[in-house]
Swiss-Prot record:
This is UPF0145 protein CTC_01500. It comes from the Bacteria. InterPro entries: UPF0145_dom_sf, UPF0145_YbjQ-like. Signal peptide: none annotated. Belongs to the UPF0145 family. Gene3D superfamilies: Hypothetical protein apc22750. Chain B.
């Protein structure tokens, strides 16, 4: 599966199938939240939050790719990410969307 944030694939003719998306919502761990509050005081990267963002994004991408595969797509182009916190910041939601396409001649 080809994934691209561009609206084209070099030297390929594409057939548009449909818009696809992946959504993932994660809740923060209370123990990690306490440790993060200490980091807020002294500064620095909050690794547990960085890992959570990466995990949420990866899961959302996997869901989008699965939807594209179910439609018979070879690629997803024009990929966009949106992220928001919910429930007073204790929950993180990531939405990944793109256009599922079939690469002609493949």
């Amino acid at each position: 599966m080809i994934l691209s944030n561009l609206s084209y694939i070099d030297n390929k003719e594409l057939e548009t199938i449909n818009i696809v998306e992946g959504v993932c919502v994660f809740s923060k761990n209370v123990g990690k939240d306490i440790m993060a509050s200490f980091k807020n005081v002294v500064g620095g990267e909050i690794k547990s939050y960085s890992e959570m963002v990466r995990d949420v994004k990866d899961t959302a991408v996997k869901k989008m790719v699965e939807e594209a595969k179910n439609l018979g797509a070879d690629a997803v182009i024009n990929i966009r990410y949106a992220m928001t916190s919910m429930s007073q910041g204790s929950t993180l939601a990531v939405i990944v969307s793109g256009t599922a396409v079939k690469v002609k001649g493949e």
